[in-house]
Design a protein with these regions (language model features):
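A residue-level signal for conserved active-site and pocket-lining positions in enzyme catalytic cores
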Residues: 8, 61, 104, 119, ...
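Short loop/turn motifs at secondary-structure junctions
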Residues: 55-57, 113, 155
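C-terminal helix of von Willebrand factor
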Residues: 151-175
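Domain-level signal for Mg2+-assisted phosphodiester chemistry and nucleotide/NA-binding surfaces
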Residues: 1-99, 109, 134, 139, ...
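Short, basic, helix/turn surface patches
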Residues: 109-118, 167-175
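Active-site histidine-anchored catalytic micro-motif
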Residues: 95-98, 110-150, 157
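A general structural signal for short secondary-structure boundary/capping elements
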Residues: 48-53, 105-110, 129-131, 164-169
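Phosphate- and divalent-cation-binding pockets in alpha/beta enzyme and binding domains
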Residues: 70, 103, 128-129, 151
Length: 175
């Protein structure tokens, strides 16, 4: 299964930080661990062919460089493209959502057929793009840390359980 992963870093990190600072830092400093869990242990969204495996061909991390510059090297070493999304307003609002949506829609037009779009964000603003992806017969997998709307969750083919992600993915490969 050809997959593309889009990480709304600010959203995931702040959601994890509300749970536990150490957990948030583990997510930010060890993306290779949870990437391996995604590749080796996370189920595929239905319907998947028997024996199919996930290949994450696109790895993009969208982050506010003013707040989270210190985590760039970890994501770079894990093979991510890093898209800087600095604050655009005096309240600190970034353009992460629109960058992610435009990139997802752009991938629909590419020669490579991506079977799965993985969205790491609890932001319900992604609900319309999840529905568009469904209309284009693409599978969607969502990780939402903290509260997410019922409509957003219902628009995903596969929801990664927040507790499973924290318990299994963030410690994947540790002995």
């Amino acid at each position: 299964m050809k997959s593309a992963l889009f990480v709304d870093f600010d959203n995931v990190y702040s959601g994890l930080r509300r749970l536990d600072q150490g957990t948030a830092d583990q997510f930010a400093r060890m993306p290779s661990a949870w990437m391996n869990w995604l590749l080796e242990s996370l189920e595929l969204p239905a319907p998947a062919r028997p024996g199919a495996r996930r290949r994450i061909l696109v790895r993009r991390c969208y982050l506010n460089p003013q707040a989270y510059q210190r985590f760039r090297p970890s994501f770079n070493l894990a093979g991510f493209e890093i898209v800087d999304c600095p604050p655009m307003t005096s309240e600190g609002k970034t353009s992460t959502d629109i960058h992610m949506v435009l990139d997802m829609v752009d991938l629909l037009q590419q020669e490579t057929h991506y079977d799965e779009f993985m969205v790491f964000s609890a932001d319900a603003d992604f609900t319309p793009v999840l529905r568009k992806l469904r209309r284009w017969d693409r599978r969607t997998t969502v990780l939402a840390i903290g509260f997410s709307s019922a409509a957003y969750r219902a628009s995903a083919d596969l929801l990664i359980d927040q507790d499973d992600f924290v318990r299994k993915a963030l410690t994947f490969g540790e002995t």
